[in-house]
């Protein structure tokens, strides 16, 4: 489902040399030098309200533009490894080349998480006792490296809420995130142990711009559950939050008048008892709009335990409608669809007078998934560590595939793919009004869970939580990068889409030389045999990659190795061999049916060939008969024409055409006589004209003889008259131009 299989391409060469890079050797040496010192620290040095530092699920790795950033806690710096070569590909560079980003003002607390801002210009350094923001330096040069490719670069850091954490020693930071807007100034959202959410701007990092007090939800927000006061008195606090995609909400939700809508981000807040609250935040206009706290959101179908009392993480997948993933420390995942509330809800009837009641959505628990935090060994069912092990779970979005997310915890890494999102969209687009039928929809096709990495293979071993997790989404290829507790780099190529956890079938392999069969196109139905085989081969449990625990110098006893071997053998037997045998039986049964169908179709084909041969012979005989009949018909037509001609010629009376011809022949002599008279008249006129012309031509022509003096006088007079006429024309043109002006 998550890991891709196949040969390594040209763009994936970096996956082979990255684990051998010198930065991991440097981090491992720093870990060796740091371990004896940490062992001598007293147990009282760690905060009682926080888990032990070595058991924290850290994430001190992130990527940006083909570069991998690793946090070095010993030097308080980032080690930047360039995954792309000078030409922009993934070719192997020098394994000793990297850049160091030093903090000018290093943090005084331990960093367990780093977050890249939406604008990709700042990095949040998150610890239990504070938060600091590092500003990434400028890039320039041929390869667009930091400050032209210097080996060491100083970076400015900005402490956020430093005075607040310094003055309140008992408070801890439980969750932190960036405000998801890319067009506004960077804002950091903090959830502290006093059950308050504070929003800080980097322009004023010591004073919160907005504060959301969660402990006073009963007095300042719309409460749908009367028993919420008793729950708050028991000390239930928020443990995590997550932003959803932009949504348009009315101004009345922010306490403003008007019917217009405001674009805001929904903020889903998860409490430890499993309840979820909702508020809307818009920082577009200073100082920002914070909506009233709505909730707890009703969950359907209802459960007595409210779907667990150990909730630890929430994730909002970027789709419409929103899908919330709620994780518990026991390894349960709840996929909840956020839909509009129903009118017949009992809670809404109590507060029907409030206009904001329509804005409270409901959470429809589409499905529940249980993660295998610790491996269920074949002979370890009675081991208490196997059933009682629990740990916080962190949820990570997949930037390449919106319908997939990843889970990290102390015992390893899981990937979860939701293949029913498109069916959910089709269901919501239909005219169905019964939203409870979502449960029936969830039984058709469940999500796929893949156990990628196991860092706690044995119940008696201490877990070795990973230190970094990142998904490379760019042109280098979707890849999962995990940094173990000993700074080993593990890489798994990912698929771009969610696929079932079953091996690929032969019929799904692409072959450009073989044309697609039209029958295969017709066979692409929801109940096709290919999908049936996929459902049989679908695996619910897999053998993850094992990682040595923190006690790496102590070899496990043979009994524990036998347990792991037995577990792996059982998984291979049940999830691979047994299902392949079932698929083999189905394929053999299908082959037998297809052979019978082929035999019957061959018989039908031979019968059709015989019929075609007989039809062709019959068509040839009919064609010959047609030609003979056509020739006979032409002969008969010619004989009929001759017969009619002879018949008409021997008739005793004239026909109509013959009568007309007779009349025309009788009129011809009269017409000839008239034409002869007309010719005589024309001839006489011609002779008369010739006589007249001869008389005119015979008359003598008068001649005028001028002397030289007369010709000269006439020429001079004509010349003077011409000049006079020219002057008059010129005067007339001048007068005309003057008048027109």
Curated annotation (Swiss-Prot):
Component of nuclear pore complex. It is found in: Nucleus, Nuclear pore complex. This is Nuclear pore complex protein Nup88. It is linked to Fetal akinesia deformation sequence 4: A clinically and genetically heterogeneous group of disorders with congenital malformations related to impaired fetal movement. Clinical features include fetal akinesia, intrauterine growth retardation, polyhydramnios, arthrogryposis, pulmonary hypoplasia, craniofacial abnormalities, and cryptorchidism. FADS4 inheritance is autosomal recessive. It comes from Homo sapiens (Human). Ubiquitous. The keyword Nucleus applies. The keyword Phosphoprotein applies.
């Amino acid at each position: 489902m998550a890991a891709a299989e196949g040969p390594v391409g040209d763009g994936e060469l970096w996956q082979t040399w990255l684990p051998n890079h010198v930065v991991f050797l440097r981090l491992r040496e720093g870990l060796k030098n740091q371990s004896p010192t940490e062992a001598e620290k007293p147990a009282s040095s760690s905060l009682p309200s926080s888990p032990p530092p070595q058991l924290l699920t850290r994430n001190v790795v992130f990527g940006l533009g083909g570069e991998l950033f690793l946090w070095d806690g010993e030097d308080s710096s980032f080690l930047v490894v360039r995954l792309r070569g000078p030409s922009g590909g993934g070719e192997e560079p020098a394994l000793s080349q990297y850049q160091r980003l030093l903090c000018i003002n290093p943090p005084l607390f331990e960093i367990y998480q780093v977050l890249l801002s939406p604008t990709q210009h700042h990095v949040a350094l998150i610890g239990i006792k504070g938060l600091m923001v590092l500003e990434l330096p400028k890039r320039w040069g041929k390869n667009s490296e930091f400050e032209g490719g210097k080996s060491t670069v100083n970076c400015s850091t900005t402490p956020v809420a430093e005075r607040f954490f310094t003055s309140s020693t008992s408070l801890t930071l439980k969750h932190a995130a960036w405000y998801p807007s890319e067009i506004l100034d960077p804002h950091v959202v903090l959830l502290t142990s006093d059950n308050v959410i504070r929003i800080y701007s980097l322009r004023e990092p010591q004073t919160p711009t907005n504060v959301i007090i969660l402990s006073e939800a009963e007095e300042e927000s719309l409460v749908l559950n009367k028993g919420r006061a008793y729950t708050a008195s028991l000390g239930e606090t928020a443990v995590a939050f997550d932003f959803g995609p932009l949504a348009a909400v009315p101004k009345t939700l922010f306490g403003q008048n008007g019917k217009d809508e405001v674009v805001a981000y929904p903020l889903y807040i998860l409490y430890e008892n499993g309840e979820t609250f909702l508020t809307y935040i818009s920082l577009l206009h200073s100082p920002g709009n914070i909506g009233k706290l709505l909730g707890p959101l009703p969950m359907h179908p209802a459960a007595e335990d409210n779907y667990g009392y150990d909730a630890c993480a929430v994730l909002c997948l970027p789709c419409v409608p929103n899908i919330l993933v709620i994780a518990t420390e026991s390894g349960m995942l709840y996929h909840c669809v956020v839909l509009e509330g129903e009118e017949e809800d009992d809670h809404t009837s109590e507060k029907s007078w409030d206009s904001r009641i329509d804005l409270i959505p409901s959470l429809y628990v589409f499905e529940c998934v249980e993660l295998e935090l610790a491996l269920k060994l074949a002979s370890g069912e009675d081991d208490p560590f196997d059933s009682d092990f629990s740990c916080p779970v962190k949820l990570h979005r997949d930037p390449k595939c919106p319908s997939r997310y990843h889970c990290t915890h102390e015992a390893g890494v899981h990937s979860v793919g939701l293949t029913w999102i498109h069916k959910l969209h089709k269901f919501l687009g239909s005219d169905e009004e019964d939203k409870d039928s979502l449960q029936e929809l969830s039984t058709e096709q469940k999500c796929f869970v893949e156990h990628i990495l196991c860092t706690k293979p044995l119940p008696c071993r201490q877990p070795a939580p990973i230190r970094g997790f990142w998904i490379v989404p760019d042109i280098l290829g979707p890849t999962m990068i995990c940094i173990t507790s000993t700074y080993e780099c593990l890489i798994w190529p990912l698929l771009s889409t969610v696929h079932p956890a079953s091996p690929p079938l032969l019929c799904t392999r692409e072959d450009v030389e073989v044309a697609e069969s039209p029958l295969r196109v017709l066979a692409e139905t929801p109940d096709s045999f290919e999908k049936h085989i996929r459902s049989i081969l679908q695996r619910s449990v897999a053998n993850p990659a094992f990682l040595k625990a923190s006690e790496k110098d102590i070899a496990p006893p043979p009994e524990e190795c036998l347990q792991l071997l037995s577990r792996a053998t059982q998984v291979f037997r049940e999830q691979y061999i047994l299902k392949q045998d079932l698929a083999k039986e189905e394929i053999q049964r299908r082959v037998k049916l297809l052979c019978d169908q082929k035999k019957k179709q061959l018989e039908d084909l031979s019968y059709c060939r015989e019929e075609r041969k007989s039809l062709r012979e019959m068509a040839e005989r009919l064609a010959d008969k047609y030609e003979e009949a056509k020739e006979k018909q032409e002969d008969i037509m010619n004989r009929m024409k001759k017969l009619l001609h002879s018949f008409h010629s021997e008739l005793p009376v004239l026909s109509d055409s013959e009568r007309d011809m007779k009349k025309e022949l009788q009129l011809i002599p009269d017409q000839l006589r008239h034409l002869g008279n007309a010719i005589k008249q024309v001839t006489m006129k011609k002779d008369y004209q010739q006589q007249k012309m001869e008389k005119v031509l015979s008359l003598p022509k008068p001649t005028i003889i001028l002397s030289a003096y007369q010709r000269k006088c006439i020429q001079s007079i004509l010349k003077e008259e011409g000049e006079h006429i020219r002057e008059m024309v010129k005067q007339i043109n001048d007068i005309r131009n003057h008048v027109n002006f």
